[in-house]
Amino acid sequence: MIAFISDLHLGNIYANKKETEEHSYNALAKIEEKLLEYQPDLVLVGGDIFDKNKVSGKEIGVFIDFINKMNKNNIGVVSISGNHDGKYWLKESFDHAIPYILYKSGINPENGYEYYSFAGIYLKNSRDWKTLSMIEDKYDISIVGFSFYTKDRLPELYEYLSIIDREKSDYILLMHQSLKSLLPQDPAAIDLTIENYKYALFGHMHMKYYKDKIIVTPPPYSISLKEANTEKGFWLIDKKPVFVPIEDSRPFIKMAIDLDNPIEIKPNKNAILILDVYYRESQIDKLNLLKKTLSENFLYVKINPILKETSKIIVKKSENKEEIFKKYLKEDYDFFMELYEKFRDIKDPETIVQYLEFFYR
């Protein structure tokens, strides 16, 4: 049995809030807990292990600790690079990606680790062929890995894929992104032009997907707001793929309130709160107090203030009552049309505005 995880983005920080970095480490800890429960033979990591161009010692240390924990429980680790994995070093060669650097630094089978990484260069007698053979000998399964590539190298990758497909059968293909350079995040755009693989595993797309032999695994936590409320977890692949869900380590809460009818917002010091607040100019102090209170009760708070009305509406003598209502009341127009009859005998537009301001206090 193998497990497929991807897009850990270790060290990711949301909105420059340093404390949010812990979300990535907590997510990996949850994955570790599940992996130790299910005890796969191998864990495949589909790239974007790290998040930033320059990877810190702490981030590398966290990943090495992960390898050690897996190895102590007789679980091997196989990884490729994603587009986030050491872009500072990733120039023209896959060999400069972080997983390969770890391998060359001694985190490899020759030094007692069950950790294997692929650059994605399948020349004769290349390290990738040797790595493939080592995994076959140890685990009786063929894993073919390709690290992140740029679109100018697509012809080279297709050539390697055709070589692999001629020489291997029933193998697991491990890649970071789709082969369509213009649609790298659309699983429907994957076009492998090969036949003999058992499963093709992809990361990068930040979604859960399984159709036919194509599997995409999501990140273990929400990297951004748009990923909130999407499934987090990883795949276990034995006789058939099974998805293992985990709780999101970076909870986002998005909601809207009206200061005229405020509601209680339950505190969560681990969560990121995105809040639309509808207010009037007379409620500025109330809005500021809300900001202060919420920032003490959430890890990070972003408030989008939405002014319900302006204090001074410029009207023309020529404007009729209905036009004034539309201008002043905006989205409340339909409701306040019920007041229209109250203004039947008032001719002056400014007087109408004064009445509206009175009703809005």
UniProtKB/Swiss-Prot annotation:
GO terms for molecular function, please? endonuclease activity; exonuclease activity; metal ion binding
Q: Which SUPFAM superfamilies match?
A: Metallo-dependent phosphatases
Provide the cofactor note recorded for this chain's UniProt entry.
Binds 2 manganese ions per subunit.
Q: Which domain of life is it from?
A: Archaea
Write the record's keywords in alphabetical order, separated by commas.
DNA damage, DNA repair, Endonuclease, Exonuclease, Hydrolase, Manganese, Metal-binding, Nuclease
One Pfam family this sequence matches: Metallophos
The entry's active site is: H84
Notes on activation and inhibition: Nuclease activity is regulated by Rad50.
> Alphabetically, which GO biological process terms does the record hold?
DNA repair
Q: How does it assemble?
A: Homodimer. Forms a heterotetramer composed of two Mre11 subunits and two Rad50 subunits.
Annotated disulfide bonds: none
Q: Which residues bind Mn(2+) 2?
A: D48, N83, H176, H204
Q: Which residues bind Mn(2+) 1?
A: D7, H9, D48, H206
Described function: Part of the Rad50/Mre11 complex, which is involved in the early steps of DNA double-strand break (DSB) repair. The complex may facilitate opening of the processed DNA ends to aid in the recruitment of HerA and NurA. Mre11 binds to DSB ends and has both double-stranded 3'-5' exonuclease activity and single-stranded endonuclease activity.
Q: Which cofactor does it need?
A: Mn(2+)
Q: What is its EC number?
A: 3.1.-.-
This chain belongs to the protein called DNA double-strand break repair protein Mre11
Give the organism the record lists.
Answer: Nanoarchaeum equitans (strain Kin4-M)
Which InterPro entries has this protein been placed in?
Calcineurin-like_PHP_ApaH (IPR004843), DNA_Repair-Maintenance_Comp (IPR050535), Metallo-depent_PP-like (IPR029052)
Family the UniProt entry places it in? Belongs to the MRE11/RAD32 family.
